[in-house]
């Protein structure tokens, strides 16, 4: 039992010291690769927009292959921007709902008054009998 507890911290310290530098290099690698991919896609979109200047429609169609990579990215952005509008839409939705509820309440009150009147007349009729 004692040897196990002693060996555990030792094995724990080793991966920790190993994972720390690895994690740093990993994060740096991902960052640089991400930046490279970003810059590459940016340069590609720039070059593609420059090369098909409307002179060759056929080459424009071919150069559209890098373009489809851009629209999905735009779609993601659009989705994010779409996520924001629904909130105001819900507000505008709740506004008419409140209106309807208000009208409904007024109508219900009228209906209740009518039913009460009918109830009174019925009572009177039953009282007459």
From Swiss-Prot:
Residues 1-129 are annotated as: Disordered. Keywords: Chromosome, Developmental protein, Differentiation, DNA-binding, Metal-binding, Nucleosome core, Nucleus, Phosphoprotein, Spermatogenesis, Zinc. The modification Phosphoserine is found at residue 126. Testis. One of its GO terms (cellular component) is nucleosome. Zn(2+) binds at residues 12, 16, 24, 29, 31, 35, 38. The keyword Zinc applies. GO terms for biological process: acrosome reaction; penetration of zona pellucida; positive regulation of protein processing; sperm DNA condensation; spermatogenesis. Residues 73-85, 120-129 have a biased composition (Basic residues). It holds the Pfam family TP2. One of its GO terms (molecular function) is zinc ion binding. Plays a key role in the replacement of histones to protamine in the elongating spermatids of mammals. In condensing spermatids, loaded onto the nucleosomes, where it promotes the recruitment and processing of protamines, which are responsible for histone eviction. PANTHER family: NUCLEAR TRANSITION PROTEIN 2. Belongs to the nuclear transition protein 2 family. This is Nuclear transition protein 2. It comes from Canis lupus familiaris (Dog). The lineage of its organism: Eukaryota, Metazoa, Chordata, Craniata, Vertebrata. The gene is TNP2.
């Amino acid at each position: 039992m004692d040897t196990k507890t002693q060996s555990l911290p030792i094995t724990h310290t080793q991966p920790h010291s190993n994972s720390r530098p690895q994690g740093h290099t990993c994060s740096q690698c991902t960052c640089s690769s991400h930046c490279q991919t970003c810059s590459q896609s940016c340069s590609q979109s720039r070059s593609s927009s420059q090369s098909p200047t409307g002179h060759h429609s056929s080459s424009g169609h071919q150069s559209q292959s890098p373009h489809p990579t851009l629209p999905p990215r735009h779609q993601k952005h659009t989705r994010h921007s779409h996520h924001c509008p629904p909130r105001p839409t819900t507000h505008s939705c709740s506004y008419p709902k409140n209106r309807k509820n208000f009208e409904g309440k007024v109508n219900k009150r009228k209906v209740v008054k009518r039913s009460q009147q009918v109830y009174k007349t019925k009572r009177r009729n039953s009282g007459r009998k």
